Amino acid sequence: MGNTVTHFFGQALTGQGIKNVYKDLMNEAKTVYLLKGAHGFHLSAIMKKLGDYYHDKGADIEYFYDPLFDKTIEATFVKAPYNTLFLQATNPSIEPVFLGERDHVISLDDCVDEQQLSANTELIQTKQTYYEKCFNALANAIRIHDDWEVETQKHMNWRGLDDQYAALVTNLFGQN
């Protein structure tokens, strides 16, 4: 088979919060399935099975991974001729744009054992606290980086940088 499987990270954790490519992928897709509900539904395994199914039918597959959880697939994009995106859309929350046309929401809330969930309220709150600490630390780190960048640029010898770049190009490719 000539079809390919490609692996990407679908989001990045930055000082400004989570940045992701999912809106762009939704715009590229002909059909979008947004899977919404509490975490823990083994969605990654479902995403993998969906990819395997369509790969066996000859489609190219793109898997998009969560940067926080090792080997956790957040989205599976089945390329032509299907152009179908399956996306875990709870965190980050992604809402349908063309509900009922291109976008279809699959609610997993009916699968939740509310007693089990409520028994773990403290753990859920702890997770949220660490999540907020993580992004506060990233925001602080980007502020420090930006401050250093301002100071560094004040003392930069831009002409010297240009000269070094020109020397590198000459060394690699010879004279023009």
Residue positions per predicted region:
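Short beta-strand-centered segment that lines the nucleotide-binding/catalytic pocket of NTP-utilizing
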Residues: 36, 56-71
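Accessory recognition modules or surfaces
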Residues: 13-29, 75-83
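N-terminal pre-Walker A segment at the start of P-loop NTPase domains
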Residues: 1-24, 175
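Conserved beta-strand segments of the P-loop GTPase G domain that flank and frequently precede/overlap
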Residues: 34-36, 64, 86-87, 108
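Glycine-rich phosphate-binding P-loop
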Residues: 19, 31-54, 176
